[in-house]
Amino acid sequence: MLFSWREDPGAQCLLLSLLLLAASEVGSGQLHYSVSEEAKHGTFVGRIAQDLGLELAELVPRLFRVASKRHGDLLEVNLQNGILFVNSRIDREELCGRSAECSIHLEVIVDRPLQVFHVEVEVKDINDNAPVFPMAVKNLFISESRQPGSRFSLEGASDADIGTNSLLTYSLDSTEYFTLDVKRNDEEIKSLGLVLKKNLNREDTPKHYLLITAIDGGKPELTGTTQLKITVLDVNDNAPAFERTIYKVRLLENAPNGTLVVTVNATDLDEGVNKDIAYSFNTDMSADILSKFHLDPVNGQISVKGNIDFEESKSYEIQVEATDKGNPPMSDHCTVLLEIVDINDNVPELVIQSLSLPVLEDSPLSTVIALISVSDRDSGVNGQVTCSLTPHVPFKLVSTFKNYYSLVLDSPLDRESVSAYELVVTARDGGSPSLWATASVSVEVADVNDNAPAFSQSEYTVFVKENNPPGCHIFTVSARDADAQENALVSYSLVERRVGERALSSYVSVHAESGKVYALQPLDHEELELLQFQVSARDAGVPPLGSNVTLQVFVLDENDNAPALLMPRVGGIGGAVSELVPRSVGAGHVVAKVRAVDADSGYNAWLSYELQPGTGGARIPFRVGLYTGEISTTRALDEVDAPRHRLLVLVKDHGEPSLTATATVLVSLVESGQAPKASSQASAGATGPEAALVDVNVYLIVAICAVSSLLVLTLLLYTALRCSAPPTEGDCGPGKPTLVCSSAVGSWSYSQQRQQRVCSGEGLPKTDLMAFSPSLPPCPISRDREEKQDVDVDLSAKPRQPNPDWRYSASLRAGMHSSVHLEEAGILRAGPGGPDQQWPTVSSATPEPEAGEVSPPVGAGVNSNSWTFKYGPGNPKQSGPGELPDKFIIPGSPAIISIRQEPTNSQIDKSDFITFGKKEETKKKKKKKKGNKTQEKKEKGNSTTDNSDQ
């Protein structure tokens, strides 16, 4: 900053005060500097960076910049040394006019973090303007009759400077007739007048030329001059006189045209023409006043004829002259001081500078979004402006300085709820009525990855038919991410795990983009009934977010397995079964039983038996049970019947379409006396190869006993641990519930293999009897221990190890070699609700204590893992391993599972095919003396119980 009065002690004190004031203002956010007008380019103003507490090295990185509402190029900051200097010519008179205070307001903005500083630079006046008179030559007419002491008003000079630089003094050339008179009134208005010192004599000197000099109070002094050309007139010796020298008037701005301002009045003591007065504006009046006001020359009324704006000019000084019509004319002057009263006619102005757009939705609170400055050209209360913001938005306005606001974040943002805000900033002044202005700010919320992909369900259930083609589309998963752009791009993948011995990815795959799930290979219901796995959805954000969904794929059964016949090991030719039947049997005698199994489930495994008609349409005396497979006689046999019958039994399931198998049974009709011999020969022929296997059977028995002993020890240890351990959550593994699902067909199963397949965990399954109700949903059941006890049969209900007396007898082995061990497949009962399919699980033996057998269950989904045993002759009647009660009802299913107890006198044998053993031959020898009738009755009775030797 330049000072020409550096040596002055008072100036040094003033400078020190200014520096202390500037230092104190740094803490409050505003600095004060001063600079003289007309300073040269590069003139030092202040060390702004140092005063603001900023390091020079951070000016450029923090984007140090200076902003100003007006005259932004007058001052500039050197970013290398942080000095504020003069950039262009500063003219105080052009910048502030005749205002007593003149300052340049600057805004200094730095980023990272955003800070705003306010700097006020005071522009000091220098004496650079000389006094100026309105006219270079002033013509003045003075009558020679004017008396000494008469005063003639003159227009004084004006100086554009202020303060002492504008204080003017006047001087007049030396003359004996005139002197200058300068008066100062209460309004600090200097009245310049020319006073006549002695009488004029027009005849001596008709004209006088005077030079008036105006000198200002600056250093150095500047002067201005004007020349007075005085013409001496004769006659009219009374000039008009105004009632008041000064008129003070107040006028509202924006007054309409024609509004009366004031009426001036002057009187003249002369008479006649010399008394007539005409009013006019002084010839020195500015063009601006002449354009805004009108003066009636006759009545002296001043009225408005232009726009009166307080913001343009707060007051007007109007010079009015009254001139009579004498010769020469005489005049008088008065001054009208017009004060303009401000009204609230200017709306506030808003300037918004956006700094941080768009705004991240995770931005911290109090983040500065934009800077807002307001102004109002009105004064007083009319110029006091307050700002407000649209309600119910997560932003607020914070006043940082007078008429300056910051738009800051007030509450957390969520782009998924609102992606953009249209804010309206309202600036309202304090006038009555108040005026306001609005400005819109569009705030866009930028997305961050704060939402994970979400599935519409936590679990999906899918039904797929088995034998699907490889690559078959079975389902489509879809997850939605509430984020935008890359944060919403979802990719899908499998959550890999093991399914038995194979990886999950060998069964199914999922398309990464579409979420389509494909079966990579044909699924087999008999191998896998339920495939449970998880699909993961993950977005492309940083860091990525994800979620999982569970898919339960139920493999529905198709009729893809034909019935399989359980054929005997010996007897028959080319796979056919041979049976010998005495001709003496009556109607209903069971000749043989055909047994078959189907690997499918439900109706696809429900088997029925049909006897194909004989060749040539001949009627045969045999029939087959529709659901039992038992071949029995339809009538008593006689001599006319052919000795050999080839029976074709068609076994078919109830699938769509049904699959079939054919069993061939060769029935030979023999006389009653020949049947025991044939049976004996067959038994003798079977013992030959059986003897060759004795050694092998010994090893097998030893191995079976060892394995059984190990199994018993394991079960005992497991039972002891389970009784002492706390209850677990489920049977399929820790934390994994047993999955109980209802099938569309069938309502129960008894299968160790099936129980293992529906478990999604890796734990060992139990061999339980599980009853399924169609009302059960196809989803995992509760892990509650009480509910599990209602579904699973307790381990204590498992069958015990077979009694050591349960062994294969020689007759039983012979019977097994000579016949097909089959079991009834079911009994169709007609009830009130229609026929019910009964799936027997274990068949009871004859009620006698010395005979009994258990055959493998045949029905829906039952495999051929079955066994047969015989009660020892000395044991009482008891339930064998795996036998069920006579009848039990499965809740929710119409099926009634029963074990059919045959009557004592029933002729239906439980052996697969009827043979005549040695026991009948022995009885006939002992009763040789009896009649043929008694012998025939014995033969019939022995035929029904002969399976005890088998």
From Swiss-Prot:
Q: Which GO molecular function entries does the Swiss-Prot or TrEMBL record give?
A: calcium ion binding
Protein localization: Cell membrane
Please report a single Pfam family linked to this protein. Answer: Cadherin_tail
Instruction: Give the membrane topology, semicolon-separated if more than one.
Output: Single-pass type I membrane protein
Bias type Basic and acidic residues, positions:
782-797, 909-923
Q: What ranges cover the PXXP repeats?
A: 734-737, 774-777, 799-802, 832-835, 873-876, 891-894
| UniProt xrefs under Gene3D superfamilies | Cadherins (2.60.40.60)
Signal peptide residue numbers: 1-29
Q: Which residues cross the membrane?
A: 698-718
Name the segments for region: Disordered. Answer: 777-806, 831-856, 869-950
Xref: PROSITE patterns: CADHERIN_1, CADHERIN_2
Show the GO cellular component annotation of the record. plasma membrane
Task: Outline which residue ranges sit on the Cytoplasmic face.
Answer: 719-950
Q: Which sequence ranges are listed under topological domain Extracellular?
A: 30-697
Q: Which GO terms describe its biological process?
A: cell adhesion; homophilic cell adhesion via plasma membrane adhesion molecules; nervous system development
Q: Which residues are glycosylated?
A: 257, 265, 548
Cadherin domain boundaries:
30-133, 134-242, 243-350, 351-455, 456-565, 581-678
What CDD domains does this protein's entry cite?
Cadherin_repeat
Q: Return the annotated region ranges for 6 X 4 AA repeats of P-X-X-P.
A: 734-894
| Alphabetic keyword roster | Calcium, Cell adhesion, Cell membrane, Glycoprotein, Membrane, Repeat, Signal, Transmembrane, Transmembrane helix
Described by its record, this protein's role is as follows: Potential calcium-dependent cell-adhesion protein. May be involved in the establishment and maintenance of specific neuronal connections in the brain.
Q: Which PANTHER family match?
A: CADHERIN-87A (PTHR24028), PROTOCADHERIN ALPHA-3 (PTHR24028:SF327)
- Protein name from the UniProt record: Protocadherin alpha-3
